[in-house]
């Protein structure tokens, strides 16, 4: 039993050995023969012996030129050595260019990167250049006007006489005080609002005036004259305005008569 297995194994090994010896030369011969048939006549002497696809053989090959003997072995490739103009390859209009293709500068950046940079650059919100629209908005910002003491005195005196002004009366008062009708109208609106709030919170009561000497009255009069020449705020200088109205009542009567005569 064992002898039969050994004989069979030896027989099989012998057949395998013969098969490998028979196949190996045929494979080598077929590769060498096919490589020989594909190679041109002038290529054999220039290539070194060995595997044609090795790194050493590939690096040791000479550089092929249009006029070299490597291309001359192929009849359909040898004809390209005589072509000198670009028009033969690309068309007649290309041959009219004075420069070769490699002499023109090439773009190294990607077109998508350039496009992205353009739209990203246009969307940048921050810039050092001033915006004319924002400047116009800041210039149009409403600023509260400041009136002189003479203007506030006349306005307060007129408000004591009447809480509402008609169109002609408002125009005459604005002209006599050097103001605009809009300023007079807004001042009267604010003054009426303040008067209503004050009337609702405080009951009307008269405060007695404290007695004082002549020297004290003179000093107070000088201080009032100084305050009269300074700008006053109708929302915060109520006491000063009341004193000025009491002192210059006669002067304002002359002013009101002159304004109505105009």
Curated annotation (Swiss-Prot):
* Gene name, Swiss-Prot/TrEMBL: Nkx6-3
| Entry comment describing in which tissues the protein is expressed | Expressed in the developing CNS and gastro-intestinal tract.
Q: Where is this region: Disordered?
A: 197-237
Extract the SMART domains matched here.
HOX
- Keyword Cell cycle assigned to the entry: answer is no
Q: Name one GO biological process term.
A: cell fate determination
Q: Which residues bind DNA?
A: 140-199
Q: Which PROSITE patterns match?
A: HOMEOBOX_1 (PS00027), HOMEOBOX_2 (PS50071)
Question: What's the main place this protein lives?
Answer: nucleus
Q: Does the keyword Transcription regulation apply?
A: yes
Q: Name one GO cellular component term.
A: nucleus
Q: What does this protein do?
A: Putative transcription factor, which may be involved in patterning of central nervous system and pancreas.
GO MF terms here are:
DNA-binding transcription activator activity, RNA polymerase II-specific; DNA-binding transcription repressor activity, RNA polymerase II-specific; RNA polymerase II cis-regulatory region sequence-specific DNA binding
Where found in the cell? Nucleus
Q: Which UniProt keywords apply?
A: DNA-binding, Homeobox, Nucleus, Transcription, Transcription regulation
What's the protein here called? Homeobox protein Nkx-6.3
């Amino acid at each position: 039993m064992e002898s039969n297995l050994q004989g069979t194994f030896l027989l099989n090994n012998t057949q395998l050995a013969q098969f490998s010896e028979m196949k190996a030369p045929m494979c080598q011969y077929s590769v060498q023969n096919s490589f020989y048939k594909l190679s041109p006549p002038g290529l054999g002497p220039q290539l070194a012996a060995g595997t044609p696809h090795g790194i050493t053989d590939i690096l040791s090959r000479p550089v092929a030129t249009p006029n070299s003997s490597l291309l001359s072995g192929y009849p359909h490739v040898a004809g390209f050595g005589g072509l000198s103009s670009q028009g033969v390859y690309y068309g007649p209009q290309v041959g009219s260019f004075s420069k070769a293709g490699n002499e023109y500068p090439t773009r190294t950046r990607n077109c998508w990167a350039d496009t992205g940079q353009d739209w990203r650059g246009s969307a940048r919100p921050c810039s050092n250049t001033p915006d004319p629209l924002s400047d116009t908005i800041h210039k149009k910002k409403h600023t509260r006007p400041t009136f002189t003491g003479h203007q506030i005195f006349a306005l307060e005196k007129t408000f004591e006489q009447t809480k509402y002004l008609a169109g002609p009366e408002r125009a005459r008062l604005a002209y006599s005080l050097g103001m605009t009708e809009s300023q007079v109208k807004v001042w009267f609106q604010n003054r009426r609002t303040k008067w209503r709030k004050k009337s609702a919170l405080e009951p009307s009561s008269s405060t007695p005036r404290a007695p004082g000497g002549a020297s004290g009255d003179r000093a107070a009069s000088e201080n009032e004259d100084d305050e009269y020449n300074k700008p006053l705020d109708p929302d915060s200088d109520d006491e000063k305005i009341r004193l000025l109205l009491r002192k210059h009542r006669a002067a304002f009567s002359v002013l009101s008569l002159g304004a109505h005569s105009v």
